[in-house]
Structure formats: structure tokens, C-alpha cells
Amino acid sequence: MASRDSANADITPEVLLRAYACGIFPMAESIDDPTLFWVEPELRGIIPLGGFRVASRLARTVRSDVFTVTVNRDFRGVIDGCASPQPGRDDTWINRRIRELYIGLHGIGHCHSVEVWQDDDLVGGLYGVSLGRAFFGESMFHRARDASKVALVHLVARLLAGGYELLDTQFVTEHLRSFGAIEVPRQRYRALLDDALHGVADFGALPVDQPVSGAQALEIIAKN
């Protein structure tokens, strides 16, 4: 279900948080479309944190630490990377207004990024919204093989360490399905969200000022 909003100028980061608490999120038709619309899918994508799967080959890549993974070091770089064309995706829903809103959420501590680096180059990452014990994954990108997958593994480890209960992916793709993503009906999602909003999680339970090793991330996931 989607609905057009006729007063986009009135959407603030605080309004956005209230929308997430109600189970809806904004999108734009394209990067050039100045307007936003609200979305509440009939079937919602989630990754059950206790059922997150890491393929053997990816686990080897994560454990090798061929990439350096950081948190909240370059939020703008990540959202700009997500807004750039990707293989198989020529267009994006991240317009200027979306970018401004989520940078605003980041500024008040409710939106976080995971960056993946190869030497000094940002080669992948993701960003999402944190509210209560729920994390809403917004978008990811990669410029090197497996970079976005490595970001997701590190995100899940951080969510598990921080006491999160819900990882919302909005929709399910085959890529996400390989990690254990499923679709749940709207009413079931609302119940999961309501439960996750009661309580507080800690995105900083793992260090945010220094990289976490791949081995440490995989160990946290394996214990859950």
C-alpha cells in the first residue's frame, strides 16, 4: 500500500520516526522526483536475527578481513553510494529530500551506517534507522565483490550484541533470501514491531570508534 503525501515540506526527522513506529516508510519514484510517498507493504520483509545465515564462502571472506569495516564514519558517503547506479539497478528512489531526511536522522542518533573499505576507498556499505529494539535497513551498495554482504554480516553481529529484536528489510529479494529473509503479513509485522519498540537496544554495544574483526562478528552470530 502506498499513499502520496501532499505536504512533503512538513516531513521532519521526528515525523519520520513516528512513521516508522507506525510501520510505514517514505520512498520517491526516482532521484529526480521531488515528492515522497508513504509505503506500508502487505507483505513485509524481515530477517529473523536468530536465523541469519552466512554461506561458507562469504564466511571465509568475512574472516579474512580483506575489508576494513567501520560504523558511522562516512554516513554521507554511504547514502550517496546507495543513491548511485548499481549493477542491475540503473535508477534509485533516494532523491534529495530522502537524503536530507536521513542525514537529519543520523544527526539525532537514529540512523546509522556501516562502511566497508578497501585501503582508503569506500567500496560498500549500508544504512538504516534504529528505533527501540528495531532496525530498519534502508539500502546498501557495493563497488567490490561481497562488500555489501560483509556490511550486512557486521550489521547483524552488532544488532545481536546490542539486544535488537527486529531487522526490517522492507521487501525481500533473492539476495536477502539467501541470508534468511522472509515475508510476514502486515498484521504479524505490526505485532513484531510493537514488541520491538518496547525496550531499548544499543547500537554501540560493539565498539564504534575502532573496527570489529570478521572473526568476532561471526562468533557473535554463531552464538545466536
Curated annotation (Swiss-Prot):
<dbReference type="GO" id="GO:0030163">
    <property type="term" value="P:protein catabolic process"/>
</dbReference>
<dbReference type="InterPro" id="IPR042221">
    <property type="entry name" value="Leu/Phe-tRNA_Trfase_N"/>
</dbReference>
<dbReference type="InterPro" id="IPR042203">
    <property type="entry name" value="Leu/Phe-tRNA_Trfase_C"/>
</dbReference>
<keyword id="KW-0963">Cytoplasm</keyword>
<dbReference type="Pfam" id="PF03588">
    <property type="entry name" value="Leu_Phe_trans"/>
</dbReference>
<protein>
    <recommendedName>
        <fullName>Leucyl/phenylalanyl-tRNA--protein transferase</fullName>
        <ecNumber>2.3.2.6</ecNumber>
    </recommendedName>
</protein>
<comment type="similarity">
    <text>Belongs to the L/F-transferase family.</text>
</comment>
<dbReference type="InterPro" id="IPR004616">
    <property type="entry name" value="Leu/Phe-tRNA_Trfase"/>
</dbReference>
<dbReference type="InterPro" id="IPR016181">
    <property type="entry name" value="Acyl_CoA_acyltransferase"/>
</dbReference>
<keyword id="KW-0012">Acyltransferase</keyword>
<dbReference type="GO" id="GO:0005737">
    <property type="term" value="C:cytoplasm"/>
</dbReference>
<dbReference type="GO" id="GO:0008914">
    <property type="term" value="F:leucyl-tRNA--protein transferase activity"/>
</dbReference>
<comment type="function">
    <text>Functions in the N-end rule pathway of protein degradation where it conjugates Leu, Phe and, less efficiently, Met from aminoacyl-tRNAs to the N-termini of proteins containing an N-terminal arginine or lysine.</text>
</comment>
<keyword id="KW-0808">Transferase</keyword>
